[in-house]
A protein has these predicted regions:
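Cofactor-binding active-site loop characterized by glycine-rich and histidine/acidic residues
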Residues: 37-40, 44-181, 199-205, 210, ...
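A generic structural signal for short, non-catalytic loop/turn and secondary-structure boundary residues
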Residues: 25-27, 71-73, 113, 244-246
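Glycine-rich ThDP/TPP pyrophosphate-binding loop and its adjacent helix/strand module
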Residues: 127-316
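Conserved acidic/glycine
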Residues: 1-63, 69, 259, 264-268, ...
Length: 317
């Protein structure tokens, strides 16, 4: 049942295969630039001693935006993890609200700035309470999916986690229960190949996280997590399947982590400069920009304008 071939798409096929139009793709790009700009600024503020600990989303943006875009804002539920800055933006949180968490300012809506930045809950946007304890939110997502089923709602629940979390017992118990009861939940693994400093080869003996789905009787899809259209397509397929009552799906999005695990980590101790330079070749920002240019939806002037607007929004935040 596992579909372990890595999925990717081209600009020429995006409209026919996914239903996305140029307007949607450009809106995705704006969100991606805003997220990258904000992430870079937060990282800089941390280095200046002004912002709390940061788990950067750089390299993960396409996986986060593409998956969130495929679901229904305000209706479906999101159990995300500490690196999912872009999802917060897609769902409607403002840069001011998010920045207030990193700067411990009054008015931060997730937790009143009392938790790790980006942690807490925003029920109006379908964001359910985040925990910094790895993988504990995954069984909670399954419980929410069960509740939706019992209440005869067509809610789909998606839970995001990293490759390190995919080896935790909580995740496997959650996948087994969800598959047995055919619950409307999507397990979305953002695989950046490192559990803090532990490489994928030391985490699991199988070739992919997606291949584990077969053991639980659900589809497993491996997708290029730097290709936002491919991610959107895979998540849409999983959401449709869940809504029809066909049960859960495990999606493994292969992404890159451009910075240390967090601002408290030193990744030069376990990653070479050559490896980091190679990962930069799969920049989701550049990939989407190139796709937009191929279909004449992005000019140099418009690109400059989008970057300028993002910097202005972040400056004001």
């Amino acid at each position: 049942m596992a579909d372990n071939g890595s999925r990717s798409t081209s600009a020429q096929t995006h409209q026919a295969d996914t239903g996305l139009d140029d307007k949607n793709l450009l809106a995705m790009y704006r969100q991606m630039i805003l997220c990258r700009t904000m992430d870079e600024r937060i990282w800089m503020l941390n280095r200046q001693g002004k912002a709390a600990i940061v788990a950067s989303a750089q390299g993960h943006e396409a996986a986060q935006i593409g998956s969130a875009w495929a679901l229904r804002k305000g209706e479906d539920q999101f159990y995300i993890y500490y690196r999912d800055l872009a999802i917060l933006l897609v769902l409607g949180m403002t840069p001011v609200e998010i920045m207030s968490g990193f700067l411990a300012k009054e008015g931060e809506p997730l937790s009143g700035a009392r938790q790790f930045p980006t942690h807490g809950a925003y029920p109006e946007y379908g964001i359910i309470n985040l925990s910094n304890v790895v993988a504990t939110h995954v069984p909670q997502a399954v419980g929410a999916a069960l509740a939706a089923r019992m209440q005869s709602k067509d809610t789909v629940v998606i839970t995001h986690f990293g490759d390190g979390a995919s080896s935790m017992g909580d995740v496997h118990e959650a996948m087994n229960f969800a598959a047995v009861h055919k619950l409307p939940v999507i397990f979305f693994c953002e695989n950046n190949k490192y559990a803090i400093s532990v490489p994928l080869s030391k985490q699991m003996a199988v070739e992919s996280v997606a291949s584990r789905a077969q053991g639980y009787g659900m589809p497993g899809i491996e997708v290029d997590g730097c290709d936002i259209v491919a991610v959107y397509e895979a998540t849409t397929e999983a959401a449709n399947r869940a809504r029809k009552g066909d049960g859960p799906t495990l999606i493994e999005a292969r992404v890159e982590r451009y910075l240390p695990h967090t601002s408290d980590d030193d990744d030069t101790l376990y990653r070479s400069r050559e490896e980091l330079e190679e990962s930069r070749k799969r920049d989701p920002v550049k990939i989407l920009a190139d796709q937009l240019r191929q279909i004449d939806a992005l000019s140099d002037d418009l690109d400059d304008e989008i970057h300028k607007e993002a910097r202005q929004v972040v400056d004001e935040a």
